[in-house]
Amino acid sequence: MLSAKKLFFTISLIFLVACEDRDYQDCNGIINGGAYYDDCGTCVGGRTGLTECIVDCNGQLGGTAYLNQCELCVEGNTNIPQDSCSNLNFNGYSYKTVIIGQQVWLAEDLKTDQFSDGSTIPDYNLEVIDSSGNKFVTNLNDSENRTFYYSAKTLNHINPIGWRIPTKSDVESLINELGGDSIAGGKLKEAGYNSWDFPNQFATNEVGFAALGKGYRNNSGNLVNAGRRYSFWTQDTLRVIDSIETYYWTLKLSFDSNNALLVPDSSGLGHPVRLIKDH
């Protein structure tokens, strides 16, 4: 007959064996812990504070490539810099794009003669004023290098899916990203004198926006301030007291200034259009 001491020892041994059958030590050294080895061979989960590795946008297990603001797979093993952008193809033209801060802009002005639905935008005609929305085009034979000036009536009817006319707030964010309205102008303007008159002050084009001194079309269709001014429309309006005319906010850059200013302009004028990518 087993003594009480031997019986206790036997029961304890059975209990210990039973516990050993149920317990285990995870890869982090924790009994019954929840850590495990992922596909990259790293101990994750449980109390490690680590999450398992995933396949990046370049197809690399545990890679560090990611989609940037232009939805382009960059960094990691791609050998593509983080600020790279793919071109936008629209209506037979390939547009350069550029990342500035958290925004993606066209790096050149819009050059379409069609509305978004595919219908043709009427050319401006001094003898037949078109109320449906005018497109003003400089008289150049080379379609690749023509300058397009759009009336405000065309806004929101000429942009491809995923892109839009910028808001006043979009432009304010752009200006702030570049240090404020007193120094942002030079960073946006094309350097040199191919399109700008002397002195084209402080122009560096350091962010790749490549604003050209195109001037604008006045209410009569005449080209004004070519070489001395660049501006583009926003979609936001300003109602002027005692005026029947609608004014739209525009970004204005000048040949003799480093400023980048938001100023209201008449909807009857013709300005270039610069698109921003939807968030």
Indicate where each model-derived feature is located.
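Primarily marks secretory-pathway-exposed extracellular/lumenal segments that are disulfide-
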Residues: 2-98, 138-139
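Conserved positions within compact, well-structured domain cores
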Residues: 70-71, 76, 82-279
